[in-house]
């Protein structure tokens, strides 16, 4: 016989029963995202998904992302309901720029101590984002790792796979001087620049819960979920000659637009064609942030940039408006001189 205490996994800080309770909580919302190509349900060692039969030469497009330190702000403010939408948006918006239809999504949720209510709120948001994007939430991993995170802090990552017809891949190679640039409006800072945002909040001493901006608490502006552009962009791709799409994330205008431009051209953007949403004016003033830094860090109200022939601008804007998007003519493509920058913003 031994006098040693019998230890369990729960004694070490891992509650398997809580994990099972979470799965039971989320089964319903996950089921609502199901696509006909998905085989089986939650609980398997792997998720099975067939390719849609409409594709003759299907090419898979994959992506993974997180939401950065927007998560820290959400935890500090105890607002977890829309972080999942952010997570999906950051992945699916990257896929659609290549013309891909998102097929399925998986998430990774890691925490020091699993709070079932918080995790269920986050995953419900992921399911809501998947429904917006038309992709199935087919599985995920919930990792309770005591000692790795402080208290009930958590981190999330998303993984998405989409499909595009090989002949319809959008890679920017068709962009030409004279092409028009259309902007799709953003819902806020989306999921980028939050380390600077949190620094501005610290330096300014503002409480985002009580500081009002344009009739709403600052927190509402900062935690507005990232807009998911999949449905509108796929519809536009099917009906118009889209030459390129750029999702404005980390690196803002200066770094994301050149990613879809061929050599020898540049994007000329007319700053007078739109007004920054109030949150970006506030951030610039409260943090004394330079104009160049604003365009490098934030989307400044532009979530997606689309290049297409100028003759199609009016019909494209009408189509996007019908889809509920705020869209406007942002600028044009011009010839670039030498090794100069591929983005020029005119004041």
From Swiss-Prot:
Chain segments annotated as coiled-coil in the UniProt record: none
Gene3D superfamilies named in the record: PurM-like C-terminal domain, PurM-like, N-terminal domain
EC number from the UniProt entry: 6.3.3.1
Keyword ATP-binding assigned: yes
Domain of life: Bacteria
Molecular function via GO: ATP binding; phosphoribosylamine-glycine ligase activity; phosphoribosylformylglycinamidine cyclo-ligase activity
Keywords: ATP-binding, Cytoplasm, Ligase, Nucleotide-binding, Purine biosynthesis
Keyword Nucleotide-binding part of the UniProt annotation: yes
Protein name as catalogued: Phosphoribosylformylglycinamidine cyclo-ligase
Chief localisation class: cytoplasm
One Pfam family matching this protein: AIRS_C
Metabolic or biological pathway, per its Swiss-Prot or TrEMBL entry: Purine metabolism; IMP biosynthesis via de novo pathway; 5-amino-1-(5-phospho-D-ribosyl)imidazole from N(2)-formyl-N(1)-(5-phospho-D-ribosyl)glycinamide: step 2/2
Reactions the enzyme catalyzes: 2-formamido-N(1)-(5-O-phospho-beta-D-ribosyl)acetamidine + ATP = 5-amino-1-(5-phospho-beta-D-ribosyl)imidazole + ADP + phosphate + H(+)
């Amino acid at each position: 016989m031994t006098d040693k205490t019998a230890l369990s996994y729960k004694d070490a800080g891992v509650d398997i029963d809580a994990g099972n309770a979470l799965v039971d909580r989320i089964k319903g919302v996950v089921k609502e995202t199901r696509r006909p190509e998905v085989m089986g349900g939650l609980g398997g060692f792997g998720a099975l998904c067939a390719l849609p039969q409409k594709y003759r030469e299907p090419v898979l497009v994959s992506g993974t992302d997180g939401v950065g330190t927007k998560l820290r702000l959400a935890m500090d403010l105890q607002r977890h309901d829309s972080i999942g939408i952010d997570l999906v948006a950051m992945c699916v918006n990257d896929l659609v720029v290549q013309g891909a239809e998102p097929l399925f999504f998986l998430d990774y949720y890691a925490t020091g101590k699993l709070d079932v209510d918080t995790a269920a709120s986050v995953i419900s948001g992921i399911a809501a984002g998947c429904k917006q994007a038309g992709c199935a939430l087919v599985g995920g991993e919930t990792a309770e790792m005591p000692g790795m995170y402080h208290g009930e802090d958590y981190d999330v990552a998303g993984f998405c796979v989409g499909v595009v017809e090989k002949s319809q891949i959008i890679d920017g190679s068709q962009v030409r001087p004279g092409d028009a640039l259309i902007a799709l409006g953003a819902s806020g800072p989306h999921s980028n620049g939050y380390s600077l945002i949190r620094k501005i909040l610290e330096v300014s001493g503002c409480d985002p819960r009580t500081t009002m901006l344009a009739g709403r608490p600052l927190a509402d502006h900062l935690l507005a979920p990232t807009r998911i552009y999949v449905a509108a962009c796929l519809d536009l791709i099917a009906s118009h000659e889209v030459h390129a799409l750029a999702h404005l994330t980390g690196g803002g205008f200066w770094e994301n637009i050149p990613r879809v431009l061929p050599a020898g051209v540049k994007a000329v953007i007319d700053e007078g064609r739109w007004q920054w949403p109030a949150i970006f004016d506030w951030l610039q003033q409260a943090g004394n942030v330079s104009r160049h830094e604003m365009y490098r860090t934030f989307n400044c109200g532009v979530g997606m940039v689309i290049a297409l022939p100028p003759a199609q601008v009016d019909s494209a804007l009408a189509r996007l408006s019908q889809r509920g998007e705020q869209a406007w003519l942002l600028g044009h493509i011009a010839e670039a001189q030498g090794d100069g920058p591929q983005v020029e913003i005119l004041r």
